[in-house]
């Protein structure tokens, strides 16, 4: 069984409802009653609250009259009460088009509020206290969000609700407030000028002429008593601003000139080191007895070595080890040269050099091999080296022509010397050493540690001098006859002052004893002639 339902006809279709009506809220019963502002009847406190709420509602909202008209006209069935609510609702939902419009409307609202408060204060003279108008109202702008607060702070403070006071007191304060408004301070600047400190000069200290100026030296950045003229005229030696001149005759009196005889500044005597005061310490700093520093430059000796065909006559490469085919060929050629040289030299001299006791007399040592690190070369040594070189060349020519072999007995007698000579080459130049050993590294065994030395040098000359001193089988000793008291003969004073190298002795004579020129050269040559050898 089917049932048939008859629905009433719709008054309006969905197309008649506008978009604005969907966002309208139903009318509130509190806003149904409205009272005119000009009524003269006395009302209770409740009626006053309702009256204030109904009149203040449009003042708390933002205005946009264009949108309000559209929303009202689209609904023909709205009542008068709904009309007012819709007008207020449109103001809430619509945002002002510009900030200037909002700012102007806010100023206008504040002005109306101030007038309304004044009217309400005089409309009810029978009331003991005036009701707080802003009791239930919330300002949409707080102190931090209101853009007008920073330039109208004083005006807003005057408009804020004051605590409840009797009307008699308000009548007394009214002329005072009017007088204060007449004498308002100007609005503060957006960027106020900052106070800056005044620069006080030294002449400004003191204030008055009667008061004596007092300078606190702890707070002054400079001494006001010093001027360029003061420094020029004041030549006191005690002043820290005066630098003694190089010439002792300028600006110095006769009594002050001897103080600068040795270029010593008075008051700084302890900063100078005198050689006579500390003998042993200065000798340790200057001399190279330990053989740790081998980078002293001796240009004269280097020039001599390069201009006289290498290191002939110097026991330089007794333990020099080289690798490669080039070094093997050189060693084979040198073995032949060494064997022929041994024929020319007597066997007794070789036995003296290598089989000698701890100390050997100077006469028993042949002077054919001068010191490798002498700073000065004697003329006699140069002639001996040249003779030895010429003898080697003649022997090489004879040996190449004859081609005879040496006897076994001669080889056995010279076994100790030839084995050591195989490790080095007397005729190798600095260029050949650099070619075979670019880093100038010493591959010999360190006698003190028993491990390879592996020291590297910047020049072949430094490598040769290192091997002649550190890795030499016989250590050279040069004596200073001045320190030992044997300068003019005699037994001496019992002291020993020895050096392992000739350049260290020459520096000692020049620095310690102050000898230069021919006197120093004579002592150095005498020490070379009397050089001593001690087995390591």
From Swiss-Prot:
Q: Where is the composition biased (Low complexity)?
A: 154-181, 361-370
Q: Basic and acidic residues compositional bias: what residue ranges? A: 393-411
Mind telling me which GO cellular component terms the entry cites?
nucleus
| UniProt keyword Cell inner membrane, yes or no | no
User: What processes in GO biological process is this protein linked to?
Assistant: proteasome-mediated ubiquitin-dependent protein catabolic process; regulation of transcription by RNA polymerase II
Q: Which UniProt keywords apply?
A: Activator, DNA-binding, Metal-binding, Nucleus, Stress response, Transcription, Transcription regulation, Zinc, Zinc-finger
What compartments host this protein? Answer: Nucleus
Which chain segments does UniProt annotate as zinc-finger regions (C2H2-type)? 440-471
InterPro entries tied to this protein: Znf_C2H2_type
Task: Give the induction annotation.
Answer: Expression is induced by HAP43, by osmotic stress, by oxidative stress, by heavy metal stress, and during biofilm formation.
Q: Which GO terms describe its molecular function?
A: DNA-binding transcription activator activity, RNA polymerase II-specific; DNA-binding transcription factor activity; sequence-specific DNA binding; zinc ion binding
**What are the start and end residues of every segment in region (Disordered)?**
154-196, 353-375, 393-434
Looking at the keywords, is Oxidoreductase present?
no
Instruction: Report the function annotation for this chain.
Output: Transcriptional activator of a number of genes encoding proteasomal subunits. Binds to the DNA sequence 5'-GAAGGCAAAA-3', enriched in regions upstream of proteasome genes.
Q: What is this protein called?
A: Transcriptional regulator RPN4
């Amino acid at each position: 069984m089917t049932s048939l339902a008859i629905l009433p006809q719709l008054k309006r279709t969905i197309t008649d409802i506008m978009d604005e009506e969907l966002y309208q809220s139903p009318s509130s019963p509190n806003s149904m009653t409205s009272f005119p502002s000009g009524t003269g009847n006395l009302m209770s406190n409740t009626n006053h609250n309702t009256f204030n709420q109904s009149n203040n509602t449009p003042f708390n909202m933002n205005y946009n009259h264009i949108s309000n008209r559209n929303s009202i006209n689209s609904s023909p069935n709205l009542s008068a009460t709904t009309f007012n609510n819709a007008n207020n609702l449109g103001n809430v939902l619509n945002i002002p088009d510009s900030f200037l419009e909002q700012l102007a409307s806010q100023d206008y609202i504040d002005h109306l509020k101030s007038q309304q408060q004044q009217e309400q204060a005089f409309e009810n003279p029978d009331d003991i206290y005036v009701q707080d108008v802003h009791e239930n109202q919330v300002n949409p702008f707080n102190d931090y969000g209101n853009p007008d607060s920073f330039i109208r702070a004083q005006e807003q403070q005057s408009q804020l609700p004051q605590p409840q006071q009797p009307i008699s007191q308000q009548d007394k304060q009214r002329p005072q407030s009017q007088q204060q408004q007449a004498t308002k301070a100007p609005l503060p600047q957006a960027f106020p000028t900052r106070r800056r400190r005044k620069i006080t000069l030294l002449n400004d200290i003191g204030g008055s002429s009667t008061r004596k100026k007092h300078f606190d030296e702890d707070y002054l950045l400079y001494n006001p008593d010093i001027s360029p003229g003061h420094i020029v005229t004041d030549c006191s030696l005690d002043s820290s601003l005066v630098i003694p001149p190089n010439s002792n005759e300028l600006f110095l009196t006769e009594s002050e000139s001897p103080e600068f005889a040795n270029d010593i500044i008075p008051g700084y005597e302890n900063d100078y080191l005198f050689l006579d005061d500390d003998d042993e310490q200065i000798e340790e700093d200057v001399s190279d007895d330990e053989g740790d520093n081998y980078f002293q430059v001796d240009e004269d000796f280097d020039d001599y070595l390069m201009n006289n065909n290498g290191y002939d006559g110097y026991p330089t490469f007794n333990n020099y080890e080289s690798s490669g085919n080039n070094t093997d060929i050189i060693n084979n050629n040198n073995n032949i040269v060494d064997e022929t040289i041994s024929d020319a030299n007597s066997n007794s001299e070789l036995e003296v050099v290598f089989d000698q006791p701890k100390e050997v007399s100077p006469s028993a040592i042949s002077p054919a091999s001068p010191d490798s690190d002498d700073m000065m070369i004697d003329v006699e040594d140069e002639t001996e080296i040249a003779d030895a070189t010429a003898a080697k060349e003649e022997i090489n020519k004879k040996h190449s022509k004859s081609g005879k072999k040496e006897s076994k007995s001669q080889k056995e007698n010279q076994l100790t010397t030839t084995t050591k000579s195989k490790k080095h080459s007397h005729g190798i130049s600095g260029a050949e050493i650099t070619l075979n050993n670019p880093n100038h590294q010493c591959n010999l065994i360190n006698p003190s540690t028993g491990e390879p030395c592996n020291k590297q040098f910047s020049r072949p000359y430094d490598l040769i001098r290192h091997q002649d001193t550190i890795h030499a089988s016989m250590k050279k000793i040069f004596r200073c006859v001045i320190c030992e008291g044997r300068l003019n003969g005699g037994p001496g004073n019992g002291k020993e002052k020895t050096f392992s190298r000739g350049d260290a002795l020459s520096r000692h004579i020049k620095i310690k004893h102050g000898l230069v020129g021919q006197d120093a050269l004579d002592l150095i040559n005498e020490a070379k002639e009397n050089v001593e050898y001690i087995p390591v």
